[in-house]
Amino acid sequence: MNDVTTATDESGIFTSEDPIALFHEWMELARAKEPEDANAMALATADASGFPDVRMVLLKEADARGFVFYTNLESAKGLELKENSRAALCFHWKSLRRQVRVRGDVIPVSKEEADAYFATRARDSQIGAWASKQSRPLAGRFELEKQVAVFAAKFGVSRVPRPDHWSGFRVVPRHIEFWRDRPFRLHDRLVFEREKPAEAWRTKKLFP
């Protein structure tokens, strides 16, 4: 049973029955209030044995299809997502005293999407994507700088193509929770849930 109307009446912050629209409302507020990187999110993954891992990444796109980030596919997170294609995200905006948590299945973005985003990156970042063997042992800073120089010379002034080992993932949400801090830890929590992308969202409130 949907409970959004009741939640809106009580708190005044759950203003949409569409969790993606509500997320964008909160993100716009965060962009106005947070000093930098309002789109930073904790990405939690697990390997095939279930051992968890977490790190901060940047959200690059969010729409009805899901939440997109980009990475080296040979990194720890890339390999973990290959073994276990589920993940969780957490956005925390301290200035707003709000957070959003997402859980869902993870699918790769299309080559066309990855190419289009890669083309928008700074040239030095594009070269860095070729130079960095992300998450693998590094003898010293010089080794990385040497690789950067190698690929900078290779591409010269020509266009830097996207390497095959660099692309993006889309977290297709099954569960999205909106949380707002309240006095005495009597926080507001609203959850949107569904099993499949084609299903309608179900909502419920949770005890803090």
UniProtKB/Swiss-Prot annotation:
The lineage of its organism: Bacteria, Pseudomonadati, Pseudomonadota, Alphaproteobacteria, Hyphomicrobiales. Keywords: Flavoprotein, FMN, Oxidoreductase, Pyridoxine biosynthesis. PROSITE patterns: PYRIDOX_OXIDASE (PS01064). Belongs to the pyridoxamine 5'-phosphate oxidase family. Substrate binds at K60, Y117, R121, S125, R185, L186, H187. It comes from Parvibaculum lavamentivorans (strain DS-1 / DSM 13023 / NCIMB 13966). This is Pyridoxine/pyridoxamine 5'-phosphate oxidase. Gene3D superfamilies: Electron Transport, Fmn-binding Protein, Chain A. GO terms for molecular function: FMN binding; pyridoxamine phosphate oxidase activity. It catalyses: pyridoxamine 5'-phosphate + O2 + H2O = pyridoxal 5'-phosphate + H2O2 + NH4(+); pyridoxine 5'-phosphate + O2 = pyridoxal 5'-phosphate + H2O2. PANTHER family: PYRIDOXINE-5'-PHOSPHATE OXIDASE (PTHR10851:SF0), PYRIDOXINE-5-PHOSPHATE OXIDASE (PTHR10851). One of its GO terms (biological process) is pyridoxine biosynthetic process. Binds 1 FMN per subunit. Its cofactor is FMN. Catalyzes the oxidation of either pyridoxine 5'-phosphate (PNP) or pyridoxamine 5'-phosphate (PMP) into pyridoxal 5'-phosphate (PLP). FMN binds at R55, M56, V57, L58, L59, K60, Y70, T71, K77, Q99, Q134, S135, W179, R189. Its EC number is 1.4.3.5. The gene is pdxH. Homodimer. Pathway: Cofactor metabolism; pyridoxal 5'-phosphate salvage; pyridoxal 5'-phosphate from pyridoxamine 5'-phosphate: step 1/1; Cofactor metabolism; pyridoxal 5'-phosphate salvage; pyridoxal 5'-phosphate from pyridoxine 5'-phosphate: step 1/1.
